[in-house]
Amino acid sequence: MSDQRPGSEVPRGFGAPVAWVAGASRGLGLALARELGLAGYRVVITARTAADLERARELLQADGVSVRTIVHDVRDPVAARDVVAEVEATWGSIDTVIAVAGLMKVGPLPQRAEDYDQSIDIMLRGPINVVHAVLPSMQVRGDGRIGIVTSIAGLIPVPHLVPYTAAKFGALGFSRGLTEELRGSGISVSTIIPGLMRTGGHWHADYSGQPGNEYAWFTALSALPVISIEADRAAKIIVGGVLRGRSKIIFTLPALAGDLLYRLSPEAVGLLLGWAGRLLPGPGDDQQPGFRAARGVTSDAFTRITGPARRAVRRWNQQGAHQSGGDASGS
């Protein structure tokens, strides 16, 4: 193996630990794969779109990460088991898995039934499928690290994000249930609860009602330095916590403050969120992905405010081959 170049698909350190990031062709998933690779892991990245995975592989290899790509849809439990079988046959046991595949549906009620179906299939059933595929081998070994990316929206309901909130509430419950079920087994489960991050995910979110106006508020909020954090910083926090076996990883100051306030006074926080919801755009009949909704938002002030969000789109492979809001490739 010594003649393999750094970052090639068959790495130099064949005995290095293996991590699987489910939903890693862009956004937070890509940042997590990079951080795990820099920590010495051989990293398996999966997503639904081969072209975006290939571009992600190039970006990771440029950083010296040993990476393997497998096209995989987290909604398919059989496909998840196939990923595990393929990795175990070539690289060995999966030591760490992080389920991060996600999508955003932003808009007022009422929302389509398929918006709920897609959100729950990807962000609740997806982690269930991934964990159930990798868990048997971990249980045999009595060792493993599992991370499930939920959201502060899984703790505190957020206006205009009801399908997302519903799915993340479920994922959070699944993750916490796993934590208790596996306590003392040698397998740690980390429930990851991020606030807003500058991952470029606004570019692929689906906006309904008044797409341009929904895109404007969501993108501006996700770009503000105090409100959100850079994806690579988020990845360091997550990977560090997962590898240390922390059961709860919650971050951004607004998320920490919101969690505390909601536990102390859910009624007061609910009133505040209701007031904020009334300031958001009203209903409408249109639905567009972010990269289309963006065309209708051209003010100079918006352009200045959202500079960090645009840079994140470029940095984290959001302008990939697949221009759709539901690729489930990492928020």
What are these regions, as identified by a protein language model?
Residues 23-26:
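Conserved glycine-rich cofactor-binding loop
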Residues 41-55:
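Conserved glycine-rich Rossmann-like NAD(P)H-binding loop of the short-chain dehydrogenase/reductase
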Residues 71-82:
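The beta1-alpha1 cofactor-binding region of Rossmann-like NAD(H)/NADP(H)-dependent oxidoreductases
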Residues 103-117, 160-163:
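Conserved mid-core segment of classical short-chain dehydrogenase/reductases
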Residues 131, 167:
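Active-site helix of classical SDR
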Residues 151:
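Residue(s) in the substrate-gating loop at a strand-loop-helix junction
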Residues 184-256, 263, 268-280:
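SDR active-site lid
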